[in-house]
Amino acid sequence: MMRILLFVATNLAVVLVASITLSLFGFNGFMAANGVDLNLSSLLVFCAVFGFAGSLVSLFISKWMAKMSTGTQIISQPRTRHEQWLLQTVEELSREAGIKMPEVGIFPAYEANAFATGWNRNDALVAVSQGLLERFSPDEVRAVLAHEIGHVANGDMVTLALVQGVVNTFVMFFARIIGNFVDKVIFKNEEGQGIAYYVATIVAELVLGILASMIVMWFSRRREYRADEAGAQLAGTAAMIGALQRLRVEQGLPVHMPDTMKAFGINGGLKHGLAGLLMSHPPLEERIEALRRRG
């Protein structure tokens, strides 16, 4: 909770500085001279409220959404020795990482994957695919679990939700400024908000949204390296590298995990070129090389 409060306070300060900066550069006066009556401070607050609301609501219901979207079955009472081993392993890794035992589940998917989610590092969910359990060795599964525990211990779910809230805020803010500019300055509309405002705002939100997604995904890729490091510390560097190498062997298999969960899975799929800018995970080769350099 302290992380959320500090992050929100920081971004309120950013909003305030942005508003003051625009005012100092005479942006308000320029828009007013062209018939646009905008209160930038009020607009920023409005966008911040709605920008953060969506990402924070998604964060608080993330465990429920994950269970529903992936069909994850929570292990309350282990029925097999594999489930017993899974619970014991997660408990050991959680204790080493200094967090409370998360919920543990298995989701029905052929591809080898796993994810962690939850609004709090002490109230999380870690789940693995059936395919991962069936085809990976115990050491490889343990390394994957350590990676996911690393996400939880690092607070990545909260951090990414807050980063998403920030970019949502500024996408909404600048899209509405562009919409007003097009409507009032270019089309000279003097009565309310015309069709040009709505069209320009929608187009601007789409374009800015893509650019914002690149920022969020860049940040997500940085967090993957940190989770790999945490996994190496908990399970051993050799085991973590072995798990990533095994994932690389299976890289051609389709990833059926919902898009909302891919940022927190260990296997994010494969894209090249510009599409790689929208990937939540770095290439497996780069992750393996980073661990080798770390030693």
Curated annotation (Swiss-Prot):
It is a multi-pass membrane protein. Zn(2+) binds at residues 147, 151, 224. It is found in: Cell inner membrane. The keyword Calcium does not apply. It comes from the Bacteria. GO terms for biological process: proteolysis. The keyword Cell membrane applies. Keywords: Cell inner membrane, Cell membrane, Hydrolase, Membrane, Metal-binding, Metalloprotease, Protease, Transmembrane, Transmembrane helix, Zinc. GO terms for cellular component: plasma membrane. GO terms for molecular function: metalloendopeptidase activity; zinc ion binding. Its cofactor is Zn(2+). Coiled coil: none annotated. The active site is at 148. Its EC number is 3.4.24.-. Binds 1 zinc ion per subunit. Pfam families: Peptidase_M48. The chain crosses the membrane at residues 4-24, 41-61, 158-178, 199-219. HAMAP family: Pept_M48_protease_HtpX. Belongs to the peptidase M48B family. This is Protease HtpX.
